[in-house]
């Protein structure tokens, strides 16, 4: 009997604004028709994808939904799936939300994030005695402020949490958020020591490992993918290290076997947007 998967961490409401183009500083752009509100964040995106893929797969959500209309919306949307257990979702504070600016021309997105209650989510908010799953997936490192805090023994509180999940017999899986700055090596690296599955994009991998994967000219350095994946394993990833990007997806298992697949060639206009694409991968 399948024990299932727990998706923990960020529970967010995304408000997506389609824009004509990304403006320069002090310039204006138009928001076009099609403003949408949807659930977002690692928990909501990943768990709803899994629920669609296998309606019989037991799923558990762990995170915070605020005492507000947005929190009601999150629970209502996830409650549509009979195989998602919401008993470990706590109502606390204000629901996190993200204003997503989606460029109509390039389909690229830019995110403006309000942490809300997510800022306080931590190890003690998980009912470890009742949690009985095969895989514990958490995201996002760099967007869960309490778990990003330092820990004298483990480096970060996130690393401590992941080790606890492993000691409880679960395989661990992590995701990170894309951001500018120098926090990747400091916050992601400690977590990798207690990670079985690491699935992140090329820019996040580059900032974590220091291996050049995409230059300032936008060119993808496919020839460096294997070295980057090897580095993730050296940093502690136990089972699968996976990198996804628009052009390809590639991975390396615990035995050093390297796999690479090109993206599907789809008709122009087929892809309506890329919000949640990384979680879906």
What would you call each of these model-derived segments?
Residues 64, 98-101:
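Catalytic-core segment of enzymes that process non-peptidic bonds
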Residues 47-48, 206-210, 271-281:
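Short, small-residue alpha-helix embedded
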Residues 1-80, 121, 267-274:
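Glycine-rich phosphate/adenosyl-contacting loop at the front of the ribokinase-like
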């Amino acid at each position: 009997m399948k024990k299932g998967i727990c998706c923990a961490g960020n529970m967010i409401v995304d408000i997506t604004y389609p824009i004509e183009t990304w403006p320069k500083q002090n310039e204006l752009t138009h928001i076009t028709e099609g403003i949408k509100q949807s659930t977002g964040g690692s928990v909501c995106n990943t768990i709803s994808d899994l629920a669609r893929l296998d309606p019989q797969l037991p799923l558990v959500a762990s995170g915070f939904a605020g005492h507000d209309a947005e929190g009601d919306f999150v629970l209502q949307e996830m409650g549509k799936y009979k195989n998602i257990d919401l008993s470990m979702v706590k109502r606390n504070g204000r629901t996190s939300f993200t204003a997503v600016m989606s460029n109509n021309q390039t389909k690229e997105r830019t995110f403006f994030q309000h942490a809300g209650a997510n800022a306080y989510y931590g190890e003690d908010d998980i009912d470890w005695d009742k949690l009985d799953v095969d895989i514990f997936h958490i995201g996002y490192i760099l967007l869960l402020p309490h778990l990003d805090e330092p820990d004298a023994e483990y480096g970060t509180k996130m690393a401590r949490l992941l080790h606890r999940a492993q000691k409880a017999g679960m395989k661990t899986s992590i995701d990170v958020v894309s951001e500018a700055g120098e926090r990747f090596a400091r916050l992601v690296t400690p977590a990798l020591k207690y990670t079985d599955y690491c699935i992140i994009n090329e820019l996040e991998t580059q900032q974590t490992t220091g291996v050049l994967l995409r230059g300032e000219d936008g060119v993808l350095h496919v020839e460096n993918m294997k070295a980057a994946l090897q580095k993730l394993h050296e940093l502690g990833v136990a089972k699968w290290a996976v990198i996804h990007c628009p052009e390809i997806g590639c991975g390396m298992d615990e035995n050093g076997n390297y796999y690479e697949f090109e993206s599907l060639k789809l008709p122009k206009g087929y892809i309506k947007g890329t919000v949640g694409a990384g979680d879906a991968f």
